[in-house]
Structures are given as structure tokens and as C-alpha cells.
């Protein structure tokens, strides 16, 4: 029985656990649109299924009830419901309750209570006239029509808002009108003269918290009056050659002056500070005037005027040329905040509370327009970005003003909006070394910067190598690269950067040197120093042993043609031959000429031998005449061995023996003295030539026949005539 009951209850429990009741309506609000409807709204919460909402109302001070029904599938606004006329009357008290129902159940909101007077909302009033009041300055009168759909039994409250035509900021005025007051007008005072205003109006039941919508806007203008005043400023220029100084006067309408204020002209008068009697007056319709004042201080005054009167007098003191102005601004900076350019500064003079700000575009030529504005009781100044040109550099100066004196200005440059530079810097390469180079660049023209240059970045890379970069501040226009590779090509370029980005300049190529100037000078110095030392040593050696140096550089070659052997005759020749033994101790190198393998030397030797042969031939010719009478004749010639070269074998032909290029005269004379007088010239010549065997052994073996000799001079033996006397042969 128990199990049966449990099985029967299980589906019901599951269904109950899976049920999702609708969310409880919250934030109920009701508005009574006068003579139209009562509309209530609420927050439905999250819906998971079809939900129907029912608004239950109790009205007529609790005596009547009705409902307003809506659902999430059919109502355009599923969280709103309205009650319509004629079942809406004022005054009355209502109770409102919202009930939400879906397939899983019903849930109700809290009960809310409403007074219709407190939630009534009327139509907006209609403005039909805005006009100035004759004879009353700076005032306009607004007239409107009371809303038709407004409680007759209730007082209304109003809000009037107004602004100038060129302004976006509204000002508001609140006031109330009695339900019995038929004059629906309001006088708006404290306005600017000759200024056009925009007016709008709204109203509400005095007890209600709901305001009507704003009325349609209407425009009106205040009456014209005399000018409000002027602000005066000056631009001082350098003194001219005659001592007079040009001063440009600038003026504009005083702050707060009407935009439409009419001015017919300006009266200016000025005089030296030390003498008011020297006053000069000028009249102009322009907005500026240039005066040529002396070197002393001056006072300048001016007014503007129109048909209704004159403005208050504006005065300005012009300091003397030699007068020193005070300085109190310590630091100043500019920054961009949202859509404004903000300039801030710090002052060391606490008694200075008025400042004059001056700004103009930084262009190459003198600016045609200069803007200025005064600031009081503050150390900052702001200007809208749209009043300045983007990407243009502006010179901003702040002048401290204390009473009638103007202090030394503090100037900076600023951009209202910065961009990327239009072009990069022009780059050059200087002082190229082995491992170093200097990169120089020029500043970008002002018109191409589009911002304040904050830094420069140098990019450089070797061919096929890794790239490097160096960043320097904007005040540096050159940079030295170090640790480069010797004899390597590089590419380099410089990027100029602003706060908005950077732009690269032109890229250039360069190649490092193989040798530095120092290395070249060092090598040249070493070589030159070595040569200098060698020259010094050579000169010193030459001074110490001049003959030796001369002999080494220019060796003396004997010339047989200049020999004195031709002058040897008779006993002199014999006496010179007797010097043999004393000459034997002389070095062989002093008696002979060493052979040389070069063709030029051989030619010289050949010439010497020929000349010497001619000399001998002449000697034998002279002696033959005197020796014929002693000639034995008839004897057969025999071979005679060279008396001075016993080592030369007999039978050697003349061609096999070498030629000695030099025959000492004393030995030739000795041979001549031992020969018989009757010997034939040919025998004498052969006998005399056999004296050449005095040369060293190696010359005897390696000699070659000389074609210039009549007979071969290489022979080591010669024939003696058989007709020679016996004692002559023996002597030979």
C-alpha cells in the first residue's frame, strides 16, 4: 500500500521540482500624461517561458478596480501597460500591483501608491516672441503660450535655458508662474550687448517630478551699445640707425565683448613718460599700427568708438631701449590633453598674477599673423586644437606682467598635433678610417618635420652582415661609429623620430680603409729611417776611408794605351827587369786583372791586349834595327820554355793557352834585354809574348784565343830562331 502511494506521488514531485515560476516584477513606475493616459512600466526580469502580466489598479480613492493585461508575445512593450480616459481624473490616488503568470504559477509585485498630481506631465510651452526691451541694455524679453494640456487648478514651474549663437554651453534660469497669472512673459537680464541668443523653455506641474519636453528654440538679440573695451599689446623691434625704435601696436576686443559689437574706429595717443606735453594723436580703422618711438619709455593709450559712444581707455607702457626687464619664469612645458594644447609654467615671483601669452607659426619668414591672450590668477593656458594647424610648429612665449611693467618672456615650441616627418635627414660620411667613421646629417626643414624631433637613430650594416643601430638625442647631428671591420663595405642611413613615428633618410655606402694614416706614416718612417741610417753610415765610412769607398764604387781599370812602356829603352829596360825579385813579393792581384764572365768586361780586356800588342810591336821594330848586326843567323830555331812558367808544358799550341790581359812592363823589358840583337822582329814578338806566362795557372788552362792578336797569345812556348847565337839560346 505504501509503495503504491509513493509511485503515485513521484510524477507530481518531479513536476514540482522542475517548475520555473516567472520573475517578480520590480521597479514599478507610473506617469500621468495629462489628459491622455496613465502608463506604468516595470522590470520583468529574465523570462524562460510564456509570461502574462496583469496590472491591477485601484482608483477613485480606493472605490474602483480595474486591470490592464499584456503578455510577452503580443505586446510591443511587454513591460508596460496603459490606462486611458475617461477613467482617469485629477486629483486622485492610485494603487498599482503587477502580477506575472506562466504555466508554472503566478507571482505578484509589491503594492505601490501614486498621487496623480505628483506624476502628471504636461505638454511643453510654445515660445512665440523673443525681443529686446527699448531703453534697457543687455536684456531680452521672452513671451510664450501656456500648454493647453496642463492642470488648470495647479501652478506651473518653468526652466529657461539660453546661449549665444556661437556657443555650445547652455545656461539655465528657473522660475514659477501662478495659475491665475495671465502674463506669460519673462525678462532675461545680464546679457551681452548686441548679441544674439538662443532660447528654449519647459514647464511642469508644481507638485510633479516630471518636466515637459523642451520647447522649440527661438532666437533674439540684445540692443547695441558703446564698445565694451580693448585689450592692447605691442611687439618691440630692434632700434634703427637713427636711434628710433619701431613698435607695432596690436589690439582686439576685450574678453566678453559682444561678437556683433560694431566699431567705427580707434583713437590712439602716446607721449614720453617723462613729458606728457609731447602727446601725439592718431586715428585708424585697422587692427594694428606701427609707431616709431625714441629710445626712452612711452605711454600709449587708445579707445574704440561707435555711434552709441566710446569704450573705456586701454593703456600700455613701452619700456626704454636700455631698460632691463625682470625675469621670473623658471620652467615651462607644453602637452596635448584630449583635444587641447596645454601650456604650464612655474614662477619664482609670487606677486605676479597676470601673464600675456603670445603664439605664432614657426616659419622661415616673418609671421604675418600673431595671436595673443592674457591670463590672470593662473599659471597655465589652454587652447583648442582646432584653432591651431595640425603638424605646424608654433612658437609660444609667456610674458609676466606686474602692474605696468612687462618681464622677460619664456619661449618654447609646440605642436597641436604631431605626425611622422615627411622626409628623413640627409646623411654624409666623413673621416673614414680602418675601423671608424663619422656619420653627419642635416636637420629636416621645419615645414617637413610635422613634430618635435625627439631622437635620431643610425642604422648601419656590413655587406652580408648583421645590422646595428645607435640612438642619439635630437641635439646631436653627428656620430662616430667604431669597431668596424677593415676594408669592408657598409650601408648606413639615419632615421628622425617624433612622438608619432620616424622616417628614414637616404642610405649611403662607404668602405673602410685597408691601412690607417698612422700605419702608413709608421711604415714610411721605418723605411725612411732605415735609409737615412744607411746613408749616414755610408757617409761616415766614406769620410773615414775615402779611397776605399771610391775604389768600391768606382774601381780603376788600367788603360794600356796610356802605359809608359813605350818610353823604356836600352839600359832602362834592363834595369826595370832587374827589379823582378823585389816585385815577387807583391801580391799577384796587384799584377794581373781578374777575369770576368760578363761580355762587356771581356771586350775591355780584348781592347787592352790589342793596344798592348801594338806597343810591343813598336818596341820590337825599333830594337830590330840595332840588333841585326848581332844576329848569329843560320841556326835552327828551337822551342824555348817560358822562363817564368816552368809548369807550362812544351808543345802547347798558342790556342790552348789563356791570354793574360796584363804583362808587367818590367818582365817584358827583361825578356827584351836577354834577346840577341839579331833576332827577327817576329821572333822577338813571339819571345816577348811568351812573357805572358806570368799569369796564374788557372788562366793558363782556361784561356781562349783572342781574334784581335796577330798570333795566338795563349801559347806557353815560342820558337827561337836557329840563327841566334848559342849563348843567347842558353840565356833564354
UniProtKB/Swiss-Prot annotation:
<dbReference type="GO" id="GO:0016020">
    <property type="term" value="C:membrane"/>
</dbReference>
<dbReference type="GO" id="GO:0007259">
    <property type="term" value="P:cell surface receptor signaling pathway via JAK-STAT"/>
</dbReference>
<feature type="signal peptide">
    <location>
        <begin position="1"/>
        <end position="19"/>
    </location>
</feature>
<dbReference type="GO" id="GO:0004896">
    <property type="term" value="F:cytokine receptor activity"/>
</dbReference>
<dbReference type="GO" id="GO:0098542">
    <property type="term" value="P:defense response to other organism"/>
</dbReference>
<feature type="glycosylation site" description="N-linked (GlcNAc...) asparagine">
    <location>
        <position position="166"/>
    </location>
</feature>
<keyword id="KW-0225">Disease variant</keyword>
<dbReference type="InterPro" id="IPR003961">
    <property type="entry name" value="FN3_dom"/>
</dbReference>
<dbReference type="GO" id="GO:0043066">
    <property type="term" value="P:negative regulation of apoptotic process"/>
</dbReference>
<feature type="glycosylation site" description="N-linked (GlcNAc...) asparagine">
    <location>
        <position position="283"/>
    </location>
</feature>
<dbReference type="InterPro" id="IPR036116">
    <property type="entry name" value="FN3_sf"/>
</dbReference>
<keyword id="KW-1003">Cell membrane</keyword>
<keyword id="KW-0770">Synapse</keyword>
<keyword id="KW-0391">Immunity</keyword>
<keyword id="KW-1008">Amyloidosis</keyword>
<feature type="topological domain" description="Cytoplasmic">
    <location>
        <begin position="541"/>
        <end position="732"/>
    </location>
</feature>
<feature type="glycosylation site" description="N-linked (GlcNAc...) asparagine">
    <location>
        <position position="37"/>
    </location>
</feature>
<dbReference type="GO" id="GO:0005886">
    <property type="term" value="C:plasma membrane"/>
</dbReference>
<feature type="domain" description="Fibronectin type-III 3">
    <location>
        <begin position="223"/>
        <end position="315"/>
    </location>
</feature>
<dbReference type="GO" id="GO:0000165">
    <property type="term" value="P:MAPK cascade"/>
</dbReference>
<feature type="glycosylation site" description="N-linked (GlcNAc...) asparagine">
    <location>
        <position position="395"/>
    </location>
</feature>
<feature type="transmembrane region" description="Helical">
    <location>
        <begin position="520"/>
        <end position="540"/>
    </location>
</feature>
<feature type="domain" description="Fibronectin type-III 5">
    <location>
        <begin position="421"/>
        <end position="515"/>
    </location>
</feature>
<dbReference type="GO" id="GO:0042734">
    <property type="term" value="C:presynaptic membrane"/>
</dbReference>
<dbReference type="Pfam" id="PF00041">
    <property type="entry name" value="fn3"/>
</dbReference>
<comment type="function">
    <text>Associates with OSMR to form the interleukin-31 receptor which activates STAT3 and to a lower extent STAT1 and STAT5. May function in skin immunity. Mediates IL31-induced itch, probably in a manner dependent on cation channels TRPA1 and TRPV1. Positively regulates numbers and cycling status of immature subsets of myeloid progenitor cells in bone marrow in vivo and enhances myeloid progenitor cell survival in vitro.</text>
</comment>
<dbReference type="GO" id="GO:0002067">
    <property type="term" value="P:glandular epithelial cell differentiation"/>
</dbReference>
<dbReference type="GO" id="GO:0019221">
    <property type="term" value="P:cytokine-mediated signaling pathway"/>
</dbReference>
<keyword id="KW-0812">Transmembrane</keyword>
<keyword id="KW-0966">Cell projection</keyword>
<dbReference type="GO" id="GO:0030225">
    <property type="term" value="P:macrophage differentiation"/>
</dbReference>
<keyword id="KW-0472">Membrane</keyword>
<dbReference type="InterPro" id="IPR013783">
    <property type="entry name" value="Ig-like_fold"/>
</dbReference>
<dbReference type="GO" id="GO:0042531">
    <property type="term" value="P:positive regulation of tyrosine phosphorylation of STAT protein"/>
</dbReference>
<dbReference type="GO" id="GO:0043031">
    <property type="term" value="P:negative regulation of macrophage activation"/>
</dbReference>
<dbReference type="GO" id="GO:0006952">
    <property type="term" value="P:defense response"/>
</dbReference>
<feature type="glycosylation site" description="N-linked (GlcNAc...) asparagine">
    <location>
        <position position="93"/>
    </location>
</feature>
<dbReference type="GO" id="GO:0019901">
    <property type="term" value="F:protein kinase binding"/>
</dbReference>
<keyword id="KW-0675">Receptor</keyword>
<feature type="glycosylation site" description="N-linked (GlcNAc...) asparagine">
    <location>
        <position position="455"/>
    </location>
</feature>
<keyword id="KW-0732">Signal</keyword>
<protein>
    <recommendedName>
        <fullName>Interleukin-31 receptor subunit alpha</fullName>
    </recommendedName>
</protein>
Amino acid at each position: 500500500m505504501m509503495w503504491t502511494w509513493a509511485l503515485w506521488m513521484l510524477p507530481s514531485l518531479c513536476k514540482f521540482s522542475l517548475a520555473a515560476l516567472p520573475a517578480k516584477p520590480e521597479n514599478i513606475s507610473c506617469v500621468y500624461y495629462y489628459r491622455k493616459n496613465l502608463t506604468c512600466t516595470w522590470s520583468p526580469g529574465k523570462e524562460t517561458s510564456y509570461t502574462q502580466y496583469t496590472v491591477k489598479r485601484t482608483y477613485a480613492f480606493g472605490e474602483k478596480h480595474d486591470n490592464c493585461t499584456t503578455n510577452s508575445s503580443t505586446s510591443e512593450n511587454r513591460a508596460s501597460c496603459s490606462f486611458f480616459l475617461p477613467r482617469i481624473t485629477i486629483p486622485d490616488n492610485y494603487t498599482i500591483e503587477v502580477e506575472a503568470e506562466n504555466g508554472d504559477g503566478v507571482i505578484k509585485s509589491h503594492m505601490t501608491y501614486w498621487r496623480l498630481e505628483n506624476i502628471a506631465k504636461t505638454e511643453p510651452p510654445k515660445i512665440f516672441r523673443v525681443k529686446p526691451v527699448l531703453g534697457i541694455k543687455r536684456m531680452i524679453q521672452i513671451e510664450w503660450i501656456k500648454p493647453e494640456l496642463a492642470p488648470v487648478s495647479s501652478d506651473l514651474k518653468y526652466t529657461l535655458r539660453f546661449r549665444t549663437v556661437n556657443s555650445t554651453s547652455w545656461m539655465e534660469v528657473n522660475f514659477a508662474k501662478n495659475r491665475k497669472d495671465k502674463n506669460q512673459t519673462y525678462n532675461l537680464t545680464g546679457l551681452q550687448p548686441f548679441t544674439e541668443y538662443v532660447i528654449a523653455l519647459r514647464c511642469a506641474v508644481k507638485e510633479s517630478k516630471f518636466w515637459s519636453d523642451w520647447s522649440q528654440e527661438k532666437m533674439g538679440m540684445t540692443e547695441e551699445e558703446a564698445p565694451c573695451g580693448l585689450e592692447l599689446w605691442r611687439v618691440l623691434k630692434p632700434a634703427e640707425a637713427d636711434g628710433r625704435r619701431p613698435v607695432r601696436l596690436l589690439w582686439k576686443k576685450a574678453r566678453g565683448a559682444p561678437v556683433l559689437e560694431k566699431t567705427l574706429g580707434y583713437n590712439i595717443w602716446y607721449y614720453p613718460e617723462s613729458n606728457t606735453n609731447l602727446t601725439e594723436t592718431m586715428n585708424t580703422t585697422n587692427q594694428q599700427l606701427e609707431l616709431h618711438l625714441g629710445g626712452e619709455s612711452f605711454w600709449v593709450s587708445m579707445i574704440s568708438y561707435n555711434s552709441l559712444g566710446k569704450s573705456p581707455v586701454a593703456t600700455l607702457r613701452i619700456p626704454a631701449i636700455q631698460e632691463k626687464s625682470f625675469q621670473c619664469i623658471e620652467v615651462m612645458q607644453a602637452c596635448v590633453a584630449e583635444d587641447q594644447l596645454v601650456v604650464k609654467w612655474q614662477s619664482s615671483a609670487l606677486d605676479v598674477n597676470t601673464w600675456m601669452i603670445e603664439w605664432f607659426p614657426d616659419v622661415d619668414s616673418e609671421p604675418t599673423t600673431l595671436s595673443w591672450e592674457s591670463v590672470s590668477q593662473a599659471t597655465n593656458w589652454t587652447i583648442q586644437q582646432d584653432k591651431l594647424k595640425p603638424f605646424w610648429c608654433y612658437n609660444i612665449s609667456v610674458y609676466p606682467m606686474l602692474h605696468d611693467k612687462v618681464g622677460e618672456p619664456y619661449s618654447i615650441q609646440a605642436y597641436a598635433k604631431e605626425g611622422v616627418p615627411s622626409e628623413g635627414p640627409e646623411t654624409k660620411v666623413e673621416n673614414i678610417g680602418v675601423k671608424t667613421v663619422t656619420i653627419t646629417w642635416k636637420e629636416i626643414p621645419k615645414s617637413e618635420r610635422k613634430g618635435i624631433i625627439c631622437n635620431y637613430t643610425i642604422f648601419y650594416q656590413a655587406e652580408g652582415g648583421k645590422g646595428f643601430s645607435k640612438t642619439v638625442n635630437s641635439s646631436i647631428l653627428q656620430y662616430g661609429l667604431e669597431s668596424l671591420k677593415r676594408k669592408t663595405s657598409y650601408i648606413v642611413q639615419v632615421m628622425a623620430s617624433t612622438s608619432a613615428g620616424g622616417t628614414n633618410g637616404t642610405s649611403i655606402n662607404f668602405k673602410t680603409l685597408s691601412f690607417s694614416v698612422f700605419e702608413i706614416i709608421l711604415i714610411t718612417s721605418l723605411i725612411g729611417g732605415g735609409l737615412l741610417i744607411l746613408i749616414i753610415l755610408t757617409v761616415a765610412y766614406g769620410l773615414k776611408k775615402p779611397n776605399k769607398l771610391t775604389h768600391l764604387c768606382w774601381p780603376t781599370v788600367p788603360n794600356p794605351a796610356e802605359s809608359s812602356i813605350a818610353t823604356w829603352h836600352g839600359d832602362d829596360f834592363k834595369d826595370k827587369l832587374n827589379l823582378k825579385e823585389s816585385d815577387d813579393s807583391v801580391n799577384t792581384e796587384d799584377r794581373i786583372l781578374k777575369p770576368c764572365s760578363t761580355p762587356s768586361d771581356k771586350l775591355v780586356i780584348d781592347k787592352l791586349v790589342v793596344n798592348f800588342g801594338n806597343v810591343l810591336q813598336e818596341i820590337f821594330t825599333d830594337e830590330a834595327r840595332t840588333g841585326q848586326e848581332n844576329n848569329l843567323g843560320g841556326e835552327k830555331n828551337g822551342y824555348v820554355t817560358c822562363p817564368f812558367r816552368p809548369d807550362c808544358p812544351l808543345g802547347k799550341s798558342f790556342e790552348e793557352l789563356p791570354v793574360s790581359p796584363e804583362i808587367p812592363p818590367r818582365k817584358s823589358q827583361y825578356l827584351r834585354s836577354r834577346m840577341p840583337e839579331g833576332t827577327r822582329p817576329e821572333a822577338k814578338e813571339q819571345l816577348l809574348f811568351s812573357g805572358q806566362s806570368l799569369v796564374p795557372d788557372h788562366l793558363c788552362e782556361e784561356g781562349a784565343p783572342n781574334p784581335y792578336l796577330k798570333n795566338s797569345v795563349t801559347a806557353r812556348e815560342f820558337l827561337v830562331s836557329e840563327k841566334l847565337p848559342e849563348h843567347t839560346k842558353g840565356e833564354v
